Amino acid sequence: MAPKKFNGFMMFVNEWREKTAEGRAASLPQAISKCGEKWKNMNTQQRGPYNKMAKNAEVAARCQVERLNCHGQSLSALEREEMEAAERELNMKRTTERIVLAGKKRHDLESTKFIFAAFNYFTKSMTNDIYIPAEFSACQFSLKSGICSMYSSHIDPGQLIFGQGSETMHHTKHTHQLPLPPNAMGESDIGRLYANIVEYLRACNPDAKPNDPLVVFATPEFMPIVKGCFRYLESDSEEPLATIHIYDIQYLLYVLKLEVLDSVDIRNVTVNRTATDSLFINDYFCYHLGISCQYHEDIDRCQYCTQSIISRWCYVFSDFMCGDLAITPLPGKHMPPKQEPKFRVSNPGNESVNSSRISSNFSKTTNKSTGKVSNETFTSGQSIVKHEIFDHSAFSADLNAAKDFPSLGGRKPKPNRNPMGKDLAPGDPRRAWNVPASKCRVKDFEDSFKMPPS
């Protein structure tokens, strides 16, 4: 729709229609015809105020206040942000698909390498999306080799955001439990740490050009954290060393699974985004030992260690796709390293275990009176172990027998079981249960005050 134009003549017409009785009764065409003759007889000085009013109205129309939502935010700004977010997500998906299809085109999809990264943080700024980092881990992964390399470091930011100490203590206490500054562990030179991280990421992409952006993957939960922590590290650097893009690892798993099935001629019938996303949500390798840093191993917080987090992501990829490509999983690369159990399970009822560990003579007796079957194992040098097997499905009891249900016979009769209107005639309306208290006699309430004998 073309913008509305203002001129001095129409301002004169509107004023004449508002201030004169004849103008209020006339329609717009009649007012234009009537005012046209007057406008022709007016000189430039007389037309000046109306031309000025037209210019002011045009300026005011350009400076109209934008529509706001209930939070006082501009609707146009929100729509623009939504469009930008949708465009970023579309670019992310296209780039992820391009990386996977490039490996498929080379017929080397199992050797295509990806970089996974995760941050732990102390606190988040309330005014922007900057996080104060506490720990960083990144690894290079491929389906064929598993975890190729890993970079991990604790971070000492030196100081926290003023006024957010309580929030920081609450967050760290319920997550990674790393010591707070000034007692924080790890690298304190943020500029050097950022340079080392960029150097490692570039080493994982030897074919990339110096000006190409670096692509790392993280879950949607960690994507804003990784972005905010990289912004914090970059702020202490003299100049930006690289452009780092953080993409969705869940979408990478979905696309990679589809291309793996297509490369081995397996028709996709069950793979969808919900199925692949649930693998990260369930986190089946969450409580495995030996995949986190030594500090979190000692305090038993392996679940929140970034080294453990990225390792579990790699294990999810391997567990979900190595079987399709006939890749033999290796402990520590495609699956958690094997751990010697620090406990012993003893089950005397397991006949196969008992017979394999020791030589024993097994006898079976049946008690006809009770219907119980008892297994007795006699072992030289050991005490006799007895285990009785009960058939809980075969149960019969008498509901009136006190020995089967002893609680039934222990119940006492309730006192004052007689109704309030026991001495009234059958037709008396006061025998009704809902008679108001004002219409009842004192005698009706006698039973209510009789206490049972102690």
Curated annotation (Swiss-Prot):
GO biological process: germ-line stem cell population maintenance; male meiotic nuclear division; negative regulation of DNA-templated transcription; oogenesis; piRNA processing; regulation of miRNA-mediated gene silencing; regulatory ncRNA-mediated gene silencing; spermatogenesis
Chain spans, region Disordered: 336-374, 405-433
Compartment(s): Cytoplasm; Nucleus
Regions of compositional bias (Low complexity) in chain numbering: 350-370
GO CC annotations on file: cytoplasm; nucleus; P granule; perinuclear region of cytoplasm
Keyword field: Cytoplasm, Developmental protein, Differentiation, DNA-binding, Meiosis, Nucleus, Oogenesis, Repressor, RNA-mediated gene silencing, Transcription, Transcription regulation
Residue ranges flagged as DNA-binding region: 2-69
Molecular-function GO terms, alphabetical: transcription cis-regulatory region binding
Function: Involved both in the piRNA and miRNA metabolic processes. As a component of the meiotic nuage, plays a central role during oogenesis by repressing transposable elements and preventing their mobilization, which is essential for the germline integrity. Repression of transposable elements is mediated via the piRNA metabolic process, which mediates the repression of transposable elements during meiosis by forming complexes composed of piRNAs and Piwi proteins and governs the repression of transposons.
Entry's family note: Belongs to the maelstrom family.
Name of the protein in its database record: Protein maelstrom
Classification of source organism: Eukaryota, Metazoa, Ecdysozoa, Arthropoda, Hexapoda
